[in-house]
Structures are given as structure tokens and as C-alpha cells.
Amino acid sequence: MINIRRLLGLQLVVAAGLLLSITHSFAQKADIGDEPGLIADDSIELPPDMQKQMVLYRTTEAPGTIIIATSERHLYVVQGNGRALRYGIGVGRDGFTWQGLLKISRKAEWPDWTPPPEMIARQPYLPRFMAGGPGNPLGARALYLGATVYRIHGTNRPDTIGTAVSSGCFRLVNADVADLYDRIPVGTKVIVRQKPEI
């Protein structure tokens, strides 16, 4: 005769094992790191052309240079030897696009956000200040562009990658901006142009 307690105990062990396996599998698939607060924001699958990848890229710029091609919705980090690391980005909406040459002036993890007065005038419902964290529109990291109000930053809206939606900043999913943040030092040259170099 089967011992009921032993059978129930065995079922609990099997159920716990399955739960741990599923949880571990989900965490690996979602690429959830050990860093507190850096949650996976890739709950939506980015289109293949918006996913981080190494690509062929001809340029005369030095390795380490960032080139942003706004019409393509891509940010390139020049690697040299005709290659670049490409990230999908969200860019400025109509009336908020720009081109130029700047340098990364500073970097911040989980940056606070204070919308500039011009943005408050256009969108008076915005908060006047928001502390850094998962709900902050700047996301997990920010790389500040010169003395401007523009940044390369994460987002709390990964569904906007590949679109023209911002007020002139460039947004990446949090996993990508954290990767970029670790690769790029302050002082890095950033070129913003309509199209990539051909």
C-alpha cells in the first residue's frame, strides 16, 4: 500500500523542482541580472533590426566613436575594421530632431529626471521631478550630451524603440543602455546625423 504522506511529499518535491526550473529558465530568458533594480524591459520582442548586433559599417571615424543615424533609428559604436556595434533606438519626433557633433559630458546610473521648462510648457501634466528608478522615463542609465538637455538614455517604454517619439533624446531598452554605458567613457565623440556614413 502506498504511503499517502510519502506520495504527497514526493509531489511537493517535484512541484518545487518544476517551479525553480521554470523560474530559473524565465530569469535566463529575460536576461535579469543580479543588479538590484535592473529589471528586464524586453518583455516585448524587439524587431530583429532593432536588436543589438555587430554589423558591417564603413566609416573614417575612430573606434569608440558613437554615430547616431536618426532616419534609421540606430546608434552605432565604431569598432574598427569595417565593423560597428549597432543598437536600436527611439529618436526625436517631428520638430525635435537635430544633427551635430558633441561629446559625452557625464554618465549617471538610475538618473533623476527634471523636465526642462519648455517640456513642462508643452506637457503641463508632467511631474516637476522624478527620482531615478524603474518607472523613470530615463531608464537605467543616461549618457549626457555636452551642455545640452539631450541624452542617450534607457526607457520605461521599450515599445517606443524604433519610433520617433522623444523630445530630442535617444532612448534604448535598459539592457542595451546598460551595455553601452559600460563600454563608453566620458569624453566619447558623438555624431548625430540624418543618415549613416556610406
Language-model features: where?
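N-terminal pre-domains immediately preceding structured catalytic cores
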Residues: 2-198
